[in-house]
A protein has these predicted regions:
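Residues on the lipid-exposed face of transmembrane beta-strands in outer-membrane beta-barrel proteins
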Residues: 44-46, 85-89, 99, 140-144, ...
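Predominantly the C-terminal beta-signal and adjacent terminal strand-loop region
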Residues: 224, 231-273
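Extracellular/periplasm-exposed beta-strand and loop segments of Gram-negative cell-envelope proteins
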Residues: 54-80, 103-136, 162-183, 212-219, ...
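Hydrophobic, lipid-facing positions within transmembrane beta-strands of outer-membrane proteins
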Residues: 40-42, 71, 81-85, 136-140, ...
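Outer-membrane beta-barrel pore domains and translocons
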Residues: 45-51, 102-104, 145, 159-163, ...
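Repeated loop/turn-to-beta-strand initiation elements of outer-membrane beta-barrel proteins
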Residues: 94-97, 150-152, 198-202, 234-240
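Cleavable N-terminal export/targeting peptides
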Residues: 1-38
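Short glycine/proline- and aromatic-enriched beta-strand/turn motifs that initiate or cap beta-hairpins
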Residues: 23-104, 268, 272
Length: 273
């Protein structure tokens, strides 16, 4: 079984098995006893994410096909640590409104080991080139926990992931050339949480979007988002988090393409009210 579905399956079992045991032994009308950190209406997380990037982009202009540029290998982009903000508003026990913002930025200057065509212009190996990639990743979503227990839950995710990517190359001869891709992307997914200790939880979620093939071969799109993390709650109002995030975006618009991946560990803190 693939690792991601297996992780979510384990979380599902951690939620469902206690409920089955309670039903088997006739537990009825028990008083809710939420785990530490589950009694809140507003949750705010500040995280530091250190992903390993894959950034493959090509851009056509004026009928001139562009080369696929590997911004990591061609320009030596290094792993960078990014700040991430997550906010969850919880008006009711099983319902959450979620927001997330991650500003992503890479920049490097150097000599190319090969000549490339980008946005209709040729960048040769003889001159230094300034390369920049900016990616604003935002998320607006709703979570419905259709199974909710004191020691875990299983829920449905409905999100809009707003992606704003801009890549540019610049040198003294050509000047600055850039390409951008902006779009709100609807995704659906699942989320599950289980408590391994009264104050320690493991949470996993996976959401996706895939444009059906065959509609128009000039337009393609895929979006996959996997997140697995643990939380240690010191009190109901404060905790520490650490986990692994994998974000994959692929798009094709006519002859412009982008294949973007960010995968890596993160850590931070969470406060609740």
């Amino acid at each position: 079984m693939p690792v991601r579905p297996m992780c979510l399956a384990v979380l599902c079992l951690s939620v469902l098995l206690p409920a089955s045991a309670a039903a088997q032994y006739g537990v009825r009308g028990s008083v809710p006893d939420p785990a530490t950190g589950e009694s809140y209406h507003l949750e705010v997380s500040g995280l530091l994410w250190s992903p390993t990037p894959t950034l493959l982009i090509s851009s056509e202009s004026l009928g001139i096909a562009g080369d696929q540029i590997d911004f990591v290998n061609d320009f030596g982009f290094e792993n960078t640590r990014f700040r991430q903000l997550r906010v969850a508003l919880r008006p009711a026990r099983k319902h959450k409104l979620r927001f997330e913002y991650t500003p992503i930025s890479y920049s490097s200057e150097g000599l190319l080991s090969r000549s490339v065509v980008f946005n209709g212009q040729r960048f040769d190996i003889s001159l230094p080139v300034q390369a920049d990639v900016r990616w604003r990743a935002m998320r607006f979503g709703y979570e419905w926990d259709f199974i909710y227990r004191d020691r875990g839950y299983l829920g449905l995710l409905i999100d809009t992931k707003y992606t704003d990517v801009q890549a540019s190359l610049e040198n003294r001869i050509v000047g600055r050339e850039f390409v951008s891709a902006r779009a709100p992307i609807p995704t659906v997914g699942v989320v599950g949480r289980g408590y391994v200790l009264p104050n320690v939880s493991i949470t996993g979620e996976f959401s996706l979007f895939r444009l059906p093939e065959g509609i128009d071969e000039n337009y393609q799109g895929r979006y996959y988002d996997f997140d697995l993390y643990g939380t240690v709650n010191f009190t109901d109002n404060f905790g520490a988090q650490g986990g692994y995030r994998s974000l994959t975006v692929f798009y094709r618009v006519d002859d412009d393409t982008g294949d973007l991946k960010l995968r890596g560990m993160y850590f931070g803190g969470v406060i609740r009210f």
